[in-house]
C-alpha cells in the first residue's frame, strides 16, 4: 500500500513517546531507577500497548515510563538519536519529531534548556548517520499552565535554529488555546511553522481557535472536524492539513474503531490529511502498519492511501525546493 516511488513521511511523531523498551531498561539499570519489571519481555506490557481494548489511562501510564528514566542530558541525546535510527528502520525518508522539553526534564529536574540542546544534537547526529531528513517541533505542554509554557518556549527559542515549528499539546478542554496567544505570536515572530493538537478531546471550536488565534497551518488529530461542515470546507479550501494517527486514536478512545475514523471523510472532502504514527513505541506499531493494516481497516482505498502519502509531503514543513530535492532523491533510489 506504500508507493515506493514517493517519499514516505511521518509528520506527527512524538520523540518522547517513542523511547524503546530496551532503552528504558538500560537507563533504569544505569541510574538505579525502580522499574515495574527487570527483563525486556516482562517490561514490555508496562511500556507498550498489548491489549486491543482502548484505555486512555493505561496508555498515558505507559507513555510516562519513557521519560521517568531520562536522568541525564546524555540520556535525552540517546533517545533523540535512536528516534532517527527507528525512522530509518521504518523506511521513512522524512520525519518531524516533536517533543516537550519540560515533560522530558521534569522527573529528574533536568535543565529544560539543556534538554533542548541534547535533543537537537541527537537528531542531528542521527540524521547524519542514517540519512534521514529529520526536523524538530517543540511542544508546549499546556497542562503545565501559561507561565511554565513561557519558560518552555524560552528554552526552545534559545535554540531556534534547531527547531522548525511549535505545537501545543495536552488537556485542550482545561487549557484552551486562548491562554497561549502570546506564546504563539512569539513563535511566528521567530519564523516557525505552527501545528496544534486540537479537535481530539474538544470539539470543532478548538480547531477553529487553533487556526484563527494561534495561526495553525496543520492540526494534530482533528477528528472532531467532521462535526462542522463549514470547518471541513475551510480546511480543504485553505489547505490546512490534518495529521491523522489511526491506531493511536483507537488506543486512546478518541474514536471507537478504525472503521469509524474520519480519515476517509477528510480525504473525500479534499482535506489534506496524512497518515502518521503518534507514539510508535508505546503503541507497538510503525508507519508501515498504519499504511498496510490500519488504513485499509479504516476503509481507505488504494488511491486514498496514496493520496494520504502525497499529503504527508505536501504538508511537510519544508520549502518547495526541499520537497523537490526529496522527491528527486527517492526517485534515484
Swiss-Prot record:
Key words, A-Z: Hydrolase, Metal-binding, Nucleotide metabolism, Zinc
GO MF terms held by the record: 2'-deoxyadenosine deaminase activity; adenosine deaminase activity; zinc ion binding
Residues annotated as catalytic: 200 (proton donor)
Domain of life: Bacteria
Reactions performed catalytically: adenosine + H2O + H(+) = inosine + NH4(+); 2'-deoxyadenosine + H2O + H(+) = 2'-deoxyinosine + NH4(+)
One GO biological process term: hypoxanthine salvage
One GO location term (cellular component): cytosol
Site (Important for catalytic activity): 221
Binding locations of substrate: 14, 16, 170, 279
Cofactor: Zn(2+)
Cofactor info, note text: Binds 1 zinc ion per subunit.
Pfam (any one): A_deaminase
Binding site for Zn(2+): 12, 14, 197, 278
Enzyme Commission no: 3.5.4.4
The protein's role, per its UniProt record: Catalyzes the hydrolytic deamination of adenosine and 2-deoxyadenosine.
Entries under HAMAP family matching the protein: A_deaminase
Record family assignment: Belongs to the metallo-dependent hydrolases superfamily. Adenosine and AMP deaminases family. Adenosine deaminase subfamily.
Designated name of the protein: Adenosine deaminase
Species for this entry: Klebsiella pneumoniae (strain 342)
Amino acid at each position: 500500500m506504500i508507493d515506493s516511488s514517493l517519499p514516505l513521511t511521518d509528520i506527527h511523531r512524538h520523540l518522547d513517546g517513542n523511547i524503546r523498551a530496551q532503552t528504558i531498561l538500560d537507563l533504569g539499570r544505569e541510574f538505579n531507577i525502580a522499574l515495574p519489571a527487570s527483563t525486556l519481555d516482562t517490561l514490555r506490557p508496562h511500556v507498550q500497548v498489548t491489549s486491543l481494548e482502548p484505555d486512555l489511562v493505561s496508555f498515558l501510564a505507559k507513555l510516562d515510563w519513557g521519560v521517568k528514566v531520562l536522568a541525564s542530558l546524555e540520556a535525552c541525546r540517546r533517545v533523540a538519536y535512536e528516534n532517527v535510527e527507528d525512522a530509518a528502520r521504518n523506511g521513512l525518508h522524512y520525519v518531524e519529531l516533536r517533543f516537550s522539553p519540560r515533560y522530558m526534564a521534569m522527573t529528574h529536574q533536568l535543565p529544560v534548556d539543556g534538554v533542548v540542546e541534547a535533543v537537537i544534537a541527537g537528531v542531528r547526529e542521527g540524521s547524519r548517520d542514517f540519512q534521514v531528513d529529520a526536523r524538530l517541533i517543540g511542544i508546549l505542554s499546556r497542562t503545565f499552565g501559561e507561565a511554565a509554557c513561557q519558560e518552555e518556549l524560552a528554552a526552545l527559542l534559545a535554540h531556534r535554529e534547531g527547531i522548525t515549528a511549535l505545537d501545543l499539546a495536552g488537556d485542550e478542554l482545561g487549557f484552551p488555546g486562548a491562554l497561549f496567544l502570546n506564546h504563539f505570536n512569539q513563535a511566528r515572530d521567530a519564523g516557525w511553522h505552527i501545528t496544534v493538537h486540537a479537535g481530539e478531546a474538544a470539539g470543532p471550536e478548538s480547531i477553529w481557535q487553533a487556526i484563527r488565534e494561534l495561526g495553525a497551518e496543520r492540526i494534530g488529530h482533528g477528528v472532531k472536524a467532521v462535526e462542522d461542515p463549514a470547518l471541513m470546507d475551510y480546511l480543504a479550501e485553505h489547505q490546512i492539513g490534518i495529521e491523522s494517527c489511526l491506531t493511536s486514536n483507537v488506543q486512546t478512545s478518541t474514536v471507537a474503531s478504525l472503521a469509524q475514523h474520519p480519515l476517509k471523510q477528510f480525504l473525500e472532502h479534499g482535506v489534506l490529511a496524512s497518515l502518521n504514527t503518534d507514539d510508535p513505541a508505546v503503541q507497538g506499531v510503525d508507519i508501515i502498519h498504519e499504511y498496510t493494516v490500519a488504513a485499509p481497516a479504516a476503509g481507505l482505498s488504494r488511491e486514498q492511501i496514496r493520496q494520504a502519502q502525497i499529503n504527508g509531503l505536501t504538508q511537510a514543513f519544508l520549502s518547495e525546493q526541499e520537497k523537490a530535492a526529496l522527491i528527486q532523491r527517492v526517485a534515484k533510489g
